[in-house]
Regions:
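Structural preference for solvent-exposed beta-strand-turn elements
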Residues: 1-421
């Protein structure tokens, strides 16, 4: 696909619902007693994989546009699926299901696409095995023998919301309490939603304690816009001359707003308006104006708050004056692709001064950039980041696979080009 270019980006946009919250609303709604009504659901491929898996375990789920109704069967109400569960490209679905399925009274198996089969599951398998789980393999396909679990006291080796959530979900079924010690704060959508549903769960800064739970009570979930999807427009509006973009109804959970902090640190003109709380999640309208950006250093405890936004932050760095250093981001190597290597390889095609490091990259920005034939590696965030990059590059650019954006943002290109009209 040839990437069309726009001269300015002006207007208001509503990005699709938050992917993390959409996944969790379906999963926890399935385990709750009663009916969970979800509005603003992200109908991307990953979240639809979650729905498919729970339907195969006997959960009645209705989809009507962005509204999803989950008829929960209770914590012990899942049924043994007739076939292997297929999670597509979704690491969230795969890892969180491990936590739920480990404590069931039936056996299951899980696999995904070729990308998922290369992604490490050992980081989930290890703590679950410490709880008594019986899981065969550390890469998909995974074979899970349902068994009785016991609580553990576990220190997370890396900040990972997926691993943390898998342990929390297993803890709902375990004998005794489960305590998790995070090394850095990761996204806490699971904790917020479970607390709203009546789980016996407490959070004390970086320590989470979950006790076995008999019942979860269904709650309605209004899914805010996904800040990871909004990030592409925040960077576009900042780097493109004569631009002003407002992204409405975006979730600004403090564990997710690293992108805003970094862009402001780089000099971006960003304001938050209409800030309010919805079902425990903080929501706002975010406006960005064209800005003169400067390089910065991104690392340390902010990384878990923007891990998915690092490719688009790298784009901002290209058009910022001076050097930007991204470090402590080894986690990028085990995403849909090795995103450190992918960003460096594709940016090199454009003549960008970028160097790969063991835990990130160094970008010397503020120089002219030319277009290129880009490879997305089947990675939705690479496809969207490269589309933003191409806007300010001289000459033509192409994408080998634009459809992979559907994983998290099915209407990305429609929304993108509306801003240029």
């Amino acid at each position: 696909m040839v990437i069309q270019k726009i001269k300015k980006a002006v207007g208001q946009i509503k990005v699709p619902g938050d992917k993390s919250i959409s996944h969790r609303a379906v999963m926890l709604g399935s385990l709750a007693n009663g009916v969970t009504e979800i509005s603003g659901f992200l109908k991307g491929a990953d979240c639809l994989s979650t729905i498919d898996c729970f339907r195969k375990m006997g959960i009645d789920i209705d989809i009507n546009g962005e509204n999803v109704t989950v008829h929960g069967n209770g914590l012990r109400g899942l049924k043994k699926p007739d076939e292997m569960l297929y999670t597509g490209n979704s690491g969230t679905t795969t890892r969180l299901l491990c936590g739920i399925l480990a404590g069931q009274n039936f056996d299951t198996s899980i696999t995904g696409d070729t990308s998922i089969q290369k992604r490490p599951m050992g980081r989930v398998v290890k703590p679950l095995s410490m709880m008594g789980a019986k899981i065969e393999n550390e890469y998909c396909p995974l074979y899970i023998t349902g068994t009785k679990l016991h609580g553990i006291d576990y220190k997370m080796p890396v900040a990972s919301a997926q691993v943390k959530t898998a342990i929390i979900l297993a803890g709902l079924y375990a004998d005794g309490e489960t305590v998790i010690h995070e090394i850095e704060k990761s996204r806490d959508h699971t904790e917020l939603m479970l607390s709203a549903m009546g789980a016996d769960l407490t959070v004390d800064n970086l320590d989470i304690t979950v006790k076995p739970t008999n019942d979860l009570t269904a709650v309605n979930v209004d899914v805010p816009g996904d800040i990871s999807s909004a990030a592409f427009f925040l960077v576009l509006g900042a780097i493109m001359p004569n631009s002003q973009i407002t992204v409405t109804n975006v979730g600004i959970n403090p564990t997710r707003t690293g992108i805003i902090d970094v862009l402001k640190d780089m000099g971006a003109d960003i304001t938050l308006e209409n800030v309010h709380t919805s079902a425990g999640e903080t929501v706002a309208d975010i406006t960005v104006h064209s800005s003169s950006l400067k390089g910065t250093t991104v690392g340390g405890d902010i990384i878990p708050r923007l891990i998915d936004e690092l490719p688009i932050i790298a784009v901002a760095a290209v058009f910022a004056d001076g050097q930007t250093v991204i470090k402590d981001a080894q986690e990028l190597k085990v995403k849909e692709t090795n995103r450190i290597r992918a960003v460096v390889d594709e940016f090199n095609k454009c003549g960008i001064d970028i160097t790969e490091t063991d835990d990130g990259m160094i970008i010397n920005g503020g120089k002219s950039v030319h277009g290129a034939d880009f490879k997305t590696y089947g990675d939705h965030r690479m496809a969207m980041s490269l589309t933003v990059l191409a806007q300010l590059a001289d000459g033509e650019s192409t994408l080998d696979d634009s459809d992979c954006s559907c994983v998290s943002y099915p209407t990305f290109f429609d929304d993108f080009y509306k801003l240029g009209e």
